[in-house]
Each structure stands twice: as C-alpha cells, then as structure tokens.
Amino acid sequence: MTDKPKLHILLCAPRGFCAGVVRAIDAVEQALRLYGAPVYVRHEIVHNKFVVEGLKAKGAIFVEELDEVPDTDKPVIFSAHGVPKSIPAEAQSRNIFAIDATCPLVTKVHREAELHHNNGRQVLLVGHAGHPEVVGTLGQLPEGSILLVQTPGEIETLQVKDEKNLAYVTQTTLSVDDTRNMVEALTKRFPEIIGPHREDICYATTNRQEAVKRIAPIVDALLVVGSSNSSNSQRLREVAERSGCKLARLVLRADDVEWDLFSNISSLGITAGASAPEVLVEEIMAAFAERFELEVETVSTADEGVFFPLPRELRQAAS
C-alpha cells in the first residue's frame, strides 16, 4: 500500500523538440565531430539553458557578436532564430567559416519579406520587439523597410506609405490566436494587404498550442517545460491560462517547481516548448513520482514527421 496521493498526469503530444531545433543542435554537434573543439555559436543555438550548457561541455563557445570570435579556421554557427544580413556579410569580410543553422521556416519568412520588398510593397512584421528572430527578419532589408507591429492598437494608428501596396509576415513562434487577431486587424484596416500563401506560424508552434488547448480546461494545473527566454514556451503558458487552466507555470528543471502550489492537485498537464529536450520532462515526471502515485495518459492531437537536413556545408564535409 502507498500513502502517496494519486495524480493523473496528461502528457501533451506533440511536445518538445521541433525539426528546426533538432537540426540546429545536430549542426553544432556535427561541427564538433568534424572540426573538433572549439566551435563558435552566435547567440544561444536554441533558447534552452540545459541544451546550451550541454553543448558548452562538449566544446561549443557561445558569443553574442562576431567581434567576440578570434581569427580562427574553426566554424561559427548562426542560431536557429536567424540573423540580419549584416552578420553573414561581416563573417565574409573576416573570412570566417560560417554555418547558418537558421530554421528553414524562419528562412521562408525572410524570403517572403524580400520578395514583397522587391515587388515594391511595404512589409509589416507581426512579432515581439527584441526577439532574435524578429531582429533577424528586420535585418533582411534596408533599415526602415519593415514596420514592426505588436498589438492591434498599434495597427489602428499605423502610418504607411501606401495602403494599397502592403504585405505582412509574422514571427514563427507567436500565439496562434493572437496572430489571428492581428491579421484580422490588419485586413480590416488595410483590405488590400497581402499575406503569406501559407501560415508563417510554424507547424510545431501550432501543434503544441493545440495540444495545450485540449487538456488545459480539464486539469487542475499545467506545467510547461522550457526556458523563460523561449518565446514558444511562454506562449504555451499563456495559451493554458486563456484556455481555462487556473495554475499554469513555466519551469526548466524539477528544482524550479513550486511544490506548495501543487500539493492539493489531482490532475496535471505537462508539455514542453519546442526547444526543451524530453529528458527534462522525464526529470520532472520523476520528481512528481516521488510525491504522488502517478497515472499517466498521453493526449495526442497531431502526428509530426517533419525532418530538416543539416546545413549544406556540414553535409558536404561529411560525405
């Protein structure tokens, strides 16, 4: 007999790593295998401190700007979030061996923005100021060519060059519902604005939010495993709250769980952001198993079979 209280855990599926994150992490690990340590990485390769520390232990050196990289023949890898065009240009001017691990779905947004600009349209970017992905997208075109909009209120007062010659793109890790509201506000204010042929919100962001929406109303609490600087992880927590979960928390490790808040629950949802490894979910599950008698159920809302090949330089070097 056990004197532990019972806890019904609902595991969201899909959760955790997406194809772009797997590609970026694999790029660093493959570069370390091919070229040896150190390998330099501009910005956190993905927004997860556990992943970054693990790569540091293998010989990766993380920098924020290229001026922190010494003259070297070792590769410098650009993170999954993408970079402004000035960064590859700076790397080329210094003869730096650069490997671009930008997620292909982010690159798609870059190319859309360029295409609209080349066709004479002013580009609006829906996103969060300061996020590396937004910085990278803004930096694809000459300064001032893209207008960043963050709220429907900003759209109401937005000054554009020509209301009949506009296009929009979006950050890939936003809330699906928030983005839908932004697009509705854009099309209401600017009826002739052109959008992407397919949604810019990435498949993994959409799928993880849909899984949270499914279980959030029926659990006492929900944990999102991820780093505080991860946009898609923060959006999962917000989606849980908006979907009716009264207690939603973002945690990186089991040590981050505020156990007093969870002492009287009988059901718990668990998901993980697209940059959070499954080992952290397992760690948190084990910590709950020490305190509760667990009954675990997986709630699946989508099947993911997406794969992105490594950057060309790494594929060629390995062949």
From Swiss-Prot:
**What's the Enzyme Commission number for this chain?**
1.17.7.4
State the CDD domains in the record: lytB_ispH
Q: Which residues bind dimethylallyl diphosphate?
A: H47, H81, H131, S230, S231, N232, S275
**Pathway this chain belongs to:** Isoprenoid biosynthesis; dimethylallyl diphosphate biosynthesis; dimethylallyl diphosphate from (2E)-4-hydroxy-3-methylbutenyl diphosphate: step 1/1; Isoprenoid biosynthesis; isopentenyl diphosphate biosynthesis via DXP pathway; isopentenyl diphosphate from 1-deoxy-D-xylulose 5-phosphate: step 6/6
Main EC class of this protein? oxidoreductase
| UniProt GO BP | dimethylallyl diphosphate biosynthetic process; isopentenyl diphosphate biosynthetic process, methylerythritol 4-phosphate pathway; terpenoid biosynthetic process
Q: Which InterPro entries match?
A: LytB/IspH (IPR003451)
List ligand-binding residues for isopentenyl diphosphate: H47, H81, H131, S230, S231, N232, S275
For this protein, what does the record note about how its cofactor is bound?
Binds 1 [4Fe-4S] cluster per subunit.
The protein's GO terms of the molecular function aspect are: 4 iron, 4 sulfur cluster binding; 4-hydroxy-3-methylbut-2-enyl diphosphate reductase activity; metal ion binding
Per the Swiss-Prot or TrEMBL record, the active site comprises E133 (proton donor)
**Binding-site residues, (2E)-4-hydroxy-3-methylbut-2-enyl diphosphate:** H47, H81, H131, T172, S230, S231, N232, S275
Could you tell me the superkingdom of the organism this chain comes from? Bacteria
Q: Which residues bind [4Fe-4S] cluster?
A: C18, C103, C202
Cofactor needs: [4Fe-4S] cluster
Q: Which UniProt keywords apply?
A: 4Fe-4S, Iron, Iron-sulfur, Isoprene biosynthesis, Metal-binding, Oxidoreductase
What is one Pfam family matched by this protein?
LYTB
Catalysed reaction(s) here are: isopentenyl diphosphate + 2 oxidized [2Fe-2S]-[ferredoxin] + H2O = (2E)-4-hydroxy-3-methylbut-2-enyl diphosphate + 2 reduced [2Fe-2S]-[ferredoxin] + 2 H(+); dimethylallyl diphosphate + 2 oxidized [2Fe-2S]-[ferredoxin] + H2O = (2E)-4-hydroxy-3-methylbut-2-enyl diphosphate + 2 reduced [2Fe-2S]-[ferredoxin] + 2 H(+)
Similarity section? Belongs to the IspH family.
> What does the function comment of this entry state?
Catalyzes the conversion of 1-hydroxy-2-methyl-2-(E)-butenyl 4-diphosphate (HMBPP) into a mixture of isopentenyl diphosphate (IPP) and dimethylallyl diphosphate (DMAPP). Acts in the terminal step of the DOXP/MEP pathway for isoprenoid precursor biosynthesis.
PANTHER family assigned: 4-HYDROXY-3-METHYLBUT-2-ENYL DIPHOSPHATE REDUCTASE
User: What protein name is recorded for this chain?
Assistant: 4-hydroxy-3-methylbut-2-enyl diphosphate reductase
The uppermost taxa in this organism's lineage are: Bacteria, Pseudomonadati, Pseudomonadota, Alphaproteobacteria, Hyphomicrobiales
